[in-house]
Amino acid sequence: MPIGVPKVPYRIPGDEEATWVDLYNVMYRERTLFLGQEIRCEITNHITGLMVYLSIEDGNSDIFLFINSPGGWLISGMAIFDTMQTVTPDIYTICLGIAASMASFILLGGEPTKRIAFPHARIMLHQPASAYYRARTPEFLLEVEELHKVREMITRVYALRTGKPFWVVSEDMERDVFMSADEAKAYGLVDIVGDEMIDEHCDTDPVWFPEMFKDW
């Protein structure tokens, strides 16, 4: 049984023959990124660095970010979101599996009209939580104040990008709200449900793949 990252044949432009390289390296060359774990500093630096590099390499071609994550650290998630708004290319966000907590915030940060959820994906939003609830009282009060500011900022972003009133989003974030792909589309978190893309192309293409994969 193979262990580690799968290798696939890939011909680097200019080379005569294909070489075996890590699957993820091929996907990066094709401007396809994956967020498939809890959001922490390391994966945040990895994804934001790739976004900046791909933007410098080609500022016109879209970047695809696949998301299957339970969420994670607030500041790390906000760093990815802000990078998505800063780089020149449009960024597709595609949810498969689950996009919970800060992962749903990143899903929301994709280019409007280019936010996609697979038919059986689950999306969850809730209010930010603090890891310092056992701190001494003065530290705890400072943490609560900062958390309140961050919560308001995140709520405003959700309201702005979904078109929902601020108070509606704020009330929804008081608890864990799980949504299906269709419910997330109705809420404004995504623009397209994956099976809609299949229906759109099945009349003309028996098997449809994104443009970047057609030469494979």
Swiss-Prot record:
It comes from the Eukaryota. Pfam families: CLP_protease. It is found in: Plastid, Chloroplast stroma. It catalyses: Hydrolysis of proteins to small peptides in the presence of ATP and magnesium. alpha-casein is the usual test substrate. In the absence of ATP, only oligopeptides shorter than five residues are hydrolyzed (such as succinyl-Leu-Tyr-|-NHMec, and Leu-Tyr-Leu-|-Tyr-Trp, in which cleavage of the -Tyr-|-Leu- and -Tyr-|-Trp bonds also occurs). The active site is at S101 (nucleophile), H126. Its main location: plastid. The keyword Plastid applies. GO terms for molecular function: ATP-dependent peptidase activity; ATPase binding; serine-type endopeptidase activity. CDD domains: S14_ClpP_2. One of its GO terms (biological process) is protein quality control for misfolded or incompletely synthesized proteins. Gene3D superfamilies: 2-enoyl-CoA Hydratase, Chain A, domain 1. Belongs to the peptidase S14 family. Cleaves peptides in various proteins in a process that requires ATP hydrolysis. Has a chymotrypsin-like activity. Plays a major role in the degradation of misfolded proteins. Component of the chloroplastic Clp protease core complex. This is ATP-dependent Clp protease proteolytic subunit. It comes from Sorghum bicolor.
